[in-house]
């Protein structure tokens, strides 16, 4: 196999040059981080599961007209995505108080919010991804007013759809983080959903027991992290046919 050019390595994924113009190969790692990489570890099989879960959710969102960067899954750990200009903002949609919101505002974890709340965080590891307002975003040119209108509209649609999808399999979507990018097609630009959607960037609780089924199990040393990710995939009907002992998958090919 020809060597591929690595373009970027993040905490949970590696991006390689794609086989077609305007595409990238997104490789999912087993590495796990929390608290802006202050805590690090490895969750065996996480990359395989997140690849499948993100593929499934991106496809479902595409079916209701949400534009995404996803093209197709290539193998157990990789998917082909469109190359986009990432907007340096993490968008967090909250349905239930948890995590930093509970800490910041003194709201007991598990409190149902009166309505879904959108928060924005500037993507900058050196600054610990500070929370920012829409005024900051537009004033500093990270996104235009029209970009933000599109992002809010898409975020609420994504939240509505995913909330129902997860509830249908007995999971509460507490909150989640997503990213958007600008997809250029000749002179036309549109905002599309990028990055991934998986238990790495969603808070998912069992609807009956409130048991955590996401990366909080790693953050808070709750144990059984691999089993939680597998349970999410199982409920969505996408657990790979290979047994859990085979979940490591192939190593990255360069």
UniProtKB/Swiss-Prot annotation:
Q: Which domain of life is it from?
A: Bacteria
Write the Enzyme Commission number(s) for this entry: 6.3.2.6
What reaction gets catalysed by this protein?
5-amino-1-(5-phospho-D-ribosyl)imidazole-4-carboxylate + L-aspartate + ATP = (2S)-2-[5-amino-1-(5-phospho-beta-D-ribosyl)imidazole-4-carboxamido]succinate + ADP + phosphate + 2 H(+)
Transmembrane helix as a keyword? no
Identify the metabolic or biological route this protein is part of.
Purine metabolism; IMP biosynthesis via de novo pathway; 5-amino-1-(5-phospho-D-ribosyl)imidazole-4-carboxamide from 5-amino-1-(5-phospho-D-ribosyl)imidazole-4-carboxylate: step 1/2
Q: Which InterPro entries match?
A: SAICAR_synt/ADE2_N, SAICAR_synt_PurC, SAICAR_synth, SAICAR_synthetase, SAICAR_synthetase_CS
* BP term (GO), one: cobalamin biosynthetic process
Q: Which keywords are on file for this protein?
A: ATP-binding, Ligase, Nucleotide-binding, Purine biosynthesis
An example of a GO molecular function for this protein is: phosphoribosylaminoimidazolesuccinocarboxamide synthase activity
* Cellular component GO terms held in the UniProt record: cytosol
Pfam families reported for this sequence: SAICAR_synt (PF01259)
Q: Give yes or no: UniProt keyword Transmembrane helix.
A: no
| NCBIfam families with a match to the protein in the record | purC (TIGR00081)
* Similarity annotation: Belongs to the SAICAR synthetase family.
Q: Extract the HAMAP family matched here.
A: SAICAR_synth
Tell me what this protein is called: Phosphoribosylaminoimidazole-succinocarboxamide synthase
The lineage, from the top, is: Bacteria, Pseudomonadati, Pseudomonadota, Alphaproteobacteria, Acetobacterales
């Amino acid at each position: 196999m020809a060597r591929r050019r690595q373009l970027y390595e993040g905490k949970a994924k590696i991006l390689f040059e794609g086989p077609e113009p305007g595409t990238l190969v997104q490789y999912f790692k087993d590495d796990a981080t929390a608290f802006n990489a202050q805590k690090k570890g490895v969750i065996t099989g996480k990359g395989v599961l997140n690849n499948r879960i993100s593929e499934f959710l991106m496809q479902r969102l595409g079916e209701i007209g949400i534009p995404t960067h996803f093209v197709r899954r290539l193998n157990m750990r990789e998917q082909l995505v469109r190359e986009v200009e990432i907007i340096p903002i993490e968008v967090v949609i909250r349905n239930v108080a948890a995590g930093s919101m509970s800490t910041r505002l003194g709201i007991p974890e598990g409190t149902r919010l009166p309505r879904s709340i959108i928060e924005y965080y500037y993507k900058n590891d050196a600054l610990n991804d500070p929370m920012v307002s829409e005024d900051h975003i537009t004033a500093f040119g990270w996104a235009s007013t029209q970009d933000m209108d599109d992002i809010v509209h898409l975020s609420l649609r994504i939240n509505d759809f995913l909330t129902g999808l997860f509830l249908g399999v007995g999971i509460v979507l507490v909150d989640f983080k997503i990213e958007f990018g600008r997809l250029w097609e000749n002179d036309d630009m549109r905002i599309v959903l990028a990055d991934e959607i998986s238990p790495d960037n969603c808070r998912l609780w069992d609807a009956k027991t409130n048991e955590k089924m996401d990366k909080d199990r790693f953050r808070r040393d709750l144990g059984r992290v691999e089993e939680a990710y597998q349970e999410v995939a199982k409920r969505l009907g996408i657990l790979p046919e290979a047994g859990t002992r085979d979940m490591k998958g192939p190593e990255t090919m360069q």
